Amino acid sequence: MSAEQPAETASAGNPLADRITTADGSKPEGTTETTDNEQADGAAAQLGGSELNEPDYTVEVKLSDLQADPNNPLYSVKSFEDLGLDPRILQGLSAMNFRKPSKIQERALPLLLNNPPKNLVGQSQSGTGKTAAFVLNALSRLDLSTEQAQKTPQALILAPTRELARQIVGVIQCMGQFLDGLNVSTAVPADTNSRHSKIESSVVVGTPGTVMDMIRKRVMVANKLKVLVLDEADNMLDQQGLGDQCIRVKALLPKDIQVVLFSATFPTHVHQYASKFAPQANELTLQHEELTVEGIKQLYLDCSDEEDKYKTLVQLYGLLTVASSIIFVKTRASAAEIEKRMVAEGHTVASLTGGIEGSQRDAVIDQFRAGQAKVLITTNVLARGIDVSTVSMVINYDIPELHQPGAPERQADFQTYLHRIGRTGRFGRVGVSISFVSNREEWNMLNQIQQYFNCTIQRVDTKDWDEVEDIIKKTIKNTRAQAQFGR
């Protein structure tokens, strides 16, 4: 268990910056300022999050009580005040500049807050306010009336990665800043040789494996838990290992616990599984054709081979100046090689892969949020959920693919592609996604992506770098640039 810093300081520079590398070995400088003009999701505005995205979409409600009318005014709300919330939570919402519920929140909050508690399965794209919805529900169900209650876990939120867990903690601390006695703990993999101490907090945010281990070792008491939330639920229920861990965690919890599942995507087979994990649940769904990522110009670069990919990447960054960007790679070895080459060219970069210890990972993401590293090289650790408002370019150095041993051909991972490029152009901003293609198999996967999303990914000729520079710079400047995909 690791205690989090107060929300006000969560995005400040972290002294543990040994994974931030500059060409001359010096400490990087510069920070980015964020504004809190609008409601934000997933990170709070105070933590560098992006503004809420409110496109024209409708929210479909399916109630577990088939006799009930989902259009009844009881199942919709137009103001936070109408929900009968604790005034201190309303004060926290006001401090976060939450003026009114988002469309998802309008429908989700009455269902979540109703008593007796009912399970909820919500499918909602990033930037629609789902994080705030499940956090508000969790805070509303806490009993903080005694010191003992304040030290007893009552709400458990599971996330697939350490980074997303820390981001959720920041939202909880911002929203609950006026709740006396609110303590939040993280249950994430500890650094080498460190031991988890007993959790004495009312809210716990963590990863499934660590939470399961803590409960079994009695480091965390689970018999008073009232709410279980899975964020990025499709990823956790579908991914080998994580799904089993989630089931084992749930088996250790009270039978009457309220289960809340939220994710941007729910493939059919995962949705069927989710219905068993959260039985008799109310359901919220965005119409599938409305699931779009707006403001992202999709491009691809032809490279002759793997070595040419390295050279092309270095040349690309030699041309461009962007606020922040993320490079997604398949392996840790590729991440290390790219980091070495880019540092040699004078770029300030950070590398974040699964092999990095916990405190170092925290330092890397904090420095990237603060703008002290402009380029982040990562595997799929950051493909989901993480919100850094300054990211305007994502590089698919390796196209995401499904792990299918023995398959006749390589298969693109559509959901990971969608989540990856969703790191840029977030919530109405403009961004660029560039995929690298160096052989026929990679071209086939890129073509699969175009067919699946019914979109066109524009080829950029690397023989004409003036054209490359012109296209990308114009795209970033053009606030109307959009690429939409739906299915």
Curated annotation (Swiss-Prot):
Task: Give the main localization category.
Answer: cytoplasm
Residue stretches making up the Helicase C-terminal domain:
295-468
Membrane topology for this entry?
Peripheral membrane protein
Q: Which residues form the signal peptide?
A: none
Alphabetically list the UniProt keywords: ATP-binding, Cytoplasm, Helicase, Hydrolase, Membrane, mRNA transport, Nuclear pore complex, Nucleotide-binding, Nucleus, Protein transport, RNA-binding, Translocation, Transport
| Gene Ontology MF annotations | ATP binding; ATP hydrolysis activity; inositol hexakisphosphate binding; RNA binding; RNA helicase activity
Q: Any idea where this protein resides? A: Cytoplasm; Nucleus, Nuclear pore complex; Nucleus membrane
Q: Where is this region: Disordered?
A: 1-53
Q: Which reaction is recorded as catalysed by this protein?
A: ATP + H2O = ADP + phosphate + H(+)
Q: Which family does it belong to?
A: Belongs to the DEAD box helicase family. DDX19/DBP5 subfamily.
Q: What is known of its domains?
A: The Q motif is unique to and characteristic of the DEAD box family of RNA helicases and controls ATP binding and hydrolysis.
Protein name (database record): ATP-dependent RNA helicase dbp5
